[in-house]
Amino acid sequence: MTEWVPLLDNRRQLQIRELIVEATRADGIAPVGEQVLRELRGTGAKHLVAEDGDDVAAFLNLVVPDEAASENATAMAELVVAPAARRRGIGSAMVREALAEGGAGTRVWAHGDLPAAQSLATKLGLVALRRLHQMRRALADLPAIRVDASVTVRHYLGPQDDSDLLRVNNAAFSWHPEQGGWTPGDLADRFAEPWFDPRGLFLAHDVQTAKLLGFHWTKRHLDKPGMGEVYIVGVDPAAQGRGLGHLLTLVGLHHLAGLGLETVLLYVESDNQAALRTYERLGFAVALTDAAYGRA
């Protein structure tokens, strides 16, 4: 039985988390992003659940943007199917339902763009409309940090920094379907994550004006020993050209290395050539690519 569920009960939440772990173990990559895990306990997403008896055989998360969302926002779906329930048409049926429910422009993420996902997309007549690279590098032999005299860098101090952080984030990512248009609630959700460390959120200010110019939010993967992440690097468009992206990224890398981590990863849009060049100069290389499929 497959049905849309407005609110997941504790049993289903637990089974879905176990299903995600099982699929990750089978495929070598997580089938859904961290946002899906946050939304399991809320009402911000639509939940499509396929059950085999009392067990969850597949789960689809669908986020439909509201009227206040970025104009670039589209409905986004993420799907996980139990390894034992695959090749039975469950996944394709659920994707069809998501495309109908989400409306025109709906996209479905395929993490790692695995052959099975490519085959399903071909079957449904979908094409890759967006690609997101995961890049990695070792945290050894980092370049030295050189801070321009016109800039100061410090870590996050508390709620007094929130309005400036939102301002820069939403200016830097005004074009981005997920990262743009953040509210105080979006910050609060991430501050509530077990991995959040205020000492790992770095803010760059102009020395003369004290204005926030950019930030780098780092993340330590608690479930992957030795792994860190360049979670978000955002620079105010008005401050572009001052080398802040390079500086902030490097400050965060040194912080992660100081925690004893061995490897760092980040995600970047495949068509963001400026960011790609910055990260390549810092020694990052593409490790895998996620694809968002939809109708052309």
From Swiss-Prot:
It comes from the Bacteria. It catalyses: 1D-myo-inositol 2-(L-cysteinylamino)-2-deoxy-alpha-D-glucopyranoside + acetyl-CoA = mycothiol + CoA + H(+). 1D-myo-inositol 2-(L-cysteinylamino)-2-deoxy-alpha-D-glucopyranoside binds at residues 34, 178, 219, 229, 267. Keywords: Acyltransferase, Repeat, Transferase. SUPFAM superfamilies: Acyl-CoA N-acyltransferases (Nat) (SSF55729). PROSITE patterns: GNAT. It holds the Pfam family Acetyltransf_1. InterPro entries: Acyl_CoA_acyltransferase, GNAT_dom, MshD_Acetyltransferase, Mycothiol_AcTrfase. The keyword Transferase applies. Acetyl-CoA 2 binds at residues 233-235, 240-246, 272-277. CDD domains: NAT_SF. Acetyl-CoA 1 binds at residues 79-81, 87-92. Catalyzes the transfer of acetyl from acetyl-CoA to desacetylmycothiol (Cys-GlcN-Ins) to form mycothiol. This is Mycothiol acetyltransferase. It comes from Mycobacteroides abscessus (strain ATCC 19977 / DSM 44196 / CCUG 20993 / CIP 104536 / JCM 13569 / NCTC 13031 / TMC 1543 / L948). The lineage of its organism: Bacteria, Bacillati, Actinomycetota, Actinomycetes, Mycobacteriales.
